[in-house]
Amino acid sequence: MVDVIMREYYGEQLNELHEKLIAMGKACEESIKKSYEALKKKDTGLAREIMDGSIEISHMERDIESKCMKLLLLQQPVAGDLRNVSAALKIITDLERIGINAGDIAEIIETVDFDFNENNIPLRDMAEETIQMITDSMTAFVDEDIKLARNTIKRDDKVDSLFLKVREGLCSGKM
């Protein structure tokens, strides 16, 4: 009987980990959407909201990391569960970095005078692709969809290419 209760508790802990990870992913998606909107509108109020959200994303990262460590130490997961917990640890590191980058963009909006070019298609495409990649990454993790995960990884090159175009445009004054 105790084994059944402990197994149920363990399952609940894994579900809670997934829910927290999904919430963190959604927070990152929102940060990117808001960053792009704040850039377009030069909205310093929205920029401040993004910076606050960046701090919250960092708190989420620490909370999830703590949950993962407790699961590893107290439950000693094996096989698929161990892979899930290990993957969660890697994912939260990347999500936190995304949150920090969104906060950095917001800080630029607050401090730098710039003209936003509405025709900056690479920037728009980069924002949209990044948001979709986060969504797909979360889906691949929760559904354990290896094919979707691999396809998402391949799309990272597209975002890198778009970033280079954006950077080139900014440096040349064309954005």
Give the location of each predicted region.
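Cytosolic, long alpha-helical scaffolding segments
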Residues: 1-175
